[in-house]
């Protein structure tokens, strides 16, 4: 045996343990939180798992699952181009939020802080529900105190979105009448 491989003195050795303990460092990206960015990322993940390039079984497009009629309202007329352009999708989402905030501004002021069907009503919950079911259906839900709880084609209700997306700070979104991308 060569002298370089001989053990001449006691050596510290680590033996395998019965259980391996892994230490992980948690990294919290800036979008995890209660800001507009946190809101849009959470909603985008719920709608499409964050996939910009997906079309669902009902023809809704992109990360935020927009319908053609809603896109047309905001001045987007080419669905193929929309689907391939993440930046356009982000602009369209913001534009739609400003539009819904304009349509629902009086209802936001009237119902914010109240409880309907056990759900605390917040501005962000209202805007998320409007993204799901349309501003008119959210108005009906609020004004009927939850008796008109419309669901989408997959069975997700207005009250579910009100709860899931409540509590975000959307003060950065300014209401705008008839906005265009």
Where are these regions (language model features)?
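Short glycine- and hydrophobic/aromatic-rich loop-to-beta-strand nucleating segment
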Residues: 64-66
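Polyanion-binding surface elements
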Residues: 43
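Non-catalytic cell-wall polysaccharide-engagement segments
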Residues: 1-32, 36, 46-51, 55, ...
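Short Gly/aromatic-enriched secondary-structure transition segments
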Residues: 57-61
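Alpha/beta-hydrolase active-site loop
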Residues: 91
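Extracellular glycan-associated modules
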Residues: 39
């Amino acid at each position: 045996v060569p002298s370089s491989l001989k053990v001449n003195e006691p050596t510290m050795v680590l033996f395998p343990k019965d259980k391996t303990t892994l230490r992980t460092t948690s990294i919290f990206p800036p979008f995890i939180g209660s800001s507009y960015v946190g809101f849009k990322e959470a909603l985008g993940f719920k709608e499409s798992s964050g996939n910009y390039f997906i079309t669902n079984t009902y023809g809704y497009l992109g990360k935020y699952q927009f319908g053609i009629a809603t896109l047309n309202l905001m001045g987007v007329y080419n669905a193929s181009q929309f689907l391939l352009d993440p930046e356009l999708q982000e602009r369209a989402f913001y534009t739609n939020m400003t539009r819904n905030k304009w349509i629902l501004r009086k209802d936001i002021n009237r119902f914010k802080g109240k409880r309907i069907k056990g759900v605390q009503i917040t501005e962000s919950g209202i805007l998320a529900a409007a993204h799901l079911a349309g501003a008119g259906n959210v108005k009906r839900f609020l004004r009927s105190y939850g008796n008109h709880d419309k669901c989408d084609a997959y069975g997700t209700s207005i009250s579910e979105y009100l709860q899931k997306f409540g509590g975000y700070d959307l003060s950065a979104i300014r209401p705008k009448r008839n906005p265009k991308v």
